[in-house]
């Protein structure tokens, strides 16, 4: 299998004397992987994904990717946990999804038919095409997460990074998102941060525990025990 992403002893902190947020992390992500990263709040999970995206640069260590700097914005899709928007601004669902195509726009900045087709295809994938003309701010929390997934999919990425996509949403939308991701994994590599072990552990072919350092875990029992031990300080 193709190695799409390689991290070699990657470390990151803010400033010269700040605490290490990511501490000597090494891992490989192969094409077709569905990787879960779990761990306590403040464990560096989101920072690690920002390093993978190139939004932050490691203080030491190296990150290698099979995607060039030019095509990385299209090849790697990013679904954040939080999306800042002004509820008073009447942006539609389709306009929100189209914003995921910004990196494809020519210098004059107009969306083409190809962009509109890609946006509608992405909305169809997340089963929200009928809402394309609805106001984004009027959607439920679960629907908003599916729109953000569609926004990432509109660029037709080969690699998808998600930060807590099933957090704080209703069970129905949780299941829809997980089913969509399972279907996408047939042709897209996925790396997902999650706290929801009960619903998501069975989706992954590989799982890592992240608390400054990254540890590969073998099975769901190991996952649960390690998570409880590090999060609550109580090991069975």
From Swiss-Prot:
It is found in: Cell inner membrane. It holds the Pfam family ABC_tran. Its main location: membrane. Part of an ATP-driven transport system TC_0696/TC_0697/TC_0698 for a metal. Probably responsible for energy coupling to the transport system. This is Probable metal transport system ATP-binding protein TC_0697. One of its GO terms (cellular component) is plasma membrane. Gene3D superfamilies: P-loop containing nucleotide triphosphate hydrolases. ATP binds at residues 39-46. It is a peripheral membrane protein. Keywords: ATP-binding, Cell inner membrane, Cell membrane, Membrane, Nucleotide-binding, Transport. GO terms for molecular function: ATP binding; ATP hydrolysis activity. Belongs to the ABC transporter superfamily. The keyword Metal-binding does not apply. Residues 5-236 form the ABC transporter domain. PANTHER family: METAL TRANSPORT SYSTEM ATP-BINDING PROTEIN TM_0124-RELATED. InterPro entries: AAA+_ATPase (IPR003593), ABC_transporter-like_ATP-bd (IPR003439), ABC_transporter-like_CS (IPR017871), Metal_Ion_Import_ABC (IPR050153), P-loop_NTPase (IPR027417).
